[in-house]
A protein has these predicted regions:
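Active-site alpha-helical segments that house and flank conserved acidic catalytic motifs
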Residues: 5-6, 10, 102-115
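Catalytic activation segment of kinase domains across protein kinase-like and atypical kinase folds
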Residues: 31, 37-40, 110-115, 119-178
Length: 255
């Protein structure tokens, strides 16, 4: 996994997709047991920060609102300073993290990347891809494809990635409720609006990327249905995801 993380994180960086990167991998001299006995190693990651949705869940589990405020203030100061200028910085923080994740997952979908294990501990507050375990770039396009051997129900399948991301954002929202509004019901209403807007935000980012891949230079209302139909065709015919777009590019170049 360490070698895979180094290679794929560098590929993601070269593709312009926000990602952690690998600084070093050091052998421990011990064995670890996965599918088989493997040599142990420690990977050092470089990132804007290692704050994750899971970090907020851990603090929330302590029931200490002052500690949660310190964590949220630190995260805002480190990643989203503009949020402090908003009358409700914690709601704005949630909005910015949601937007950053919608953009990130749209980029994954545009290049056929399957993360594999999108739990809350693998969603960064900064919006960088992290933890390249059972991940891969698809060859033959299959929207239901999974790459984790334990994902027998397809929770983290390619097509489910936007929905899991939204679910993770909802978990982040839960941890921020005491900071968003002293009245719990008002806080829920405000946070829910942002969580529910995730899908539309994702769709906008995804379609922008698909227009670029399909060579669509002008925006038309039917572009989304065209992009979806294209994916349905290559899935039905079991075509390679990346090469199908490359063929379009080559045809345009010939013209």
């Amino acid at each position: 996994y360490k070698r895979q993380e180094y290679i794929i994180s560098e590929a993601m960086n070269a593709l312009g997709i926000p990602t952690t990167r690998s600084l070093a991998a050091v052998s421990t001299g011990e064995s670890v047991y996965r599918e088989a006995r493997l040599p142990g190693a420690v990977l050092t990651r470089v990132a804007s920060s290692h704050l994750r949705v899971g970090t907020f869940q851990f603090i929330a589990s302590k029931g200490d609102n002052s500690a949660m405020k310190k964590l949220a203030d630190y995260a805002i100061d480190r990643h989203y300073k503009d949020a402090f200028r908003n009358k409700n910085p914690y709601l704005e923080f949630l909005k910015k993290v949601s937007d950053r994740q919608a953009s990130l997952v749209a980029m994954w979908m545009n290049v056929g990347f399957i993360h594999g294990v999108m739990n809350t501990d693998n969603m960064t507050i900064s919006g960088e891809t992290i933890d390249y375990g059972p991940c891969a770039f698809m060859d033959t396009y299959d929207s239901k494809k999974v790459f984790s051997s334990i994902d027998t129900n397809g929770r983290y399948s390619f097509k489910n990635q936007p929905y899991v991301a939204q679910w993770n954002i909802a978990r982040l929202a839960e941890t921020l409720l005491p900071l968003i509004d002293e009245d719990l019901n008002r806080a829920i209403v405000k946070a829910t609006e942002i969580v529910e807007s995730f899908n539309a935000t994702f769709d906008d980012y995804w379609l922008k990327g698909m227009r670029l891949k399909l060579g669509i230079t002008n925006d038309f209302p039917e572009d989304q249905s065209l992009a979806i139909e294209f994916l349905e065709i290559i899935e039905e015919n079991e075509l390679d995801f990346t090469n199908s777009f490359l063929i379009i590019y080559d045809d345009r170049s010939d013209d």
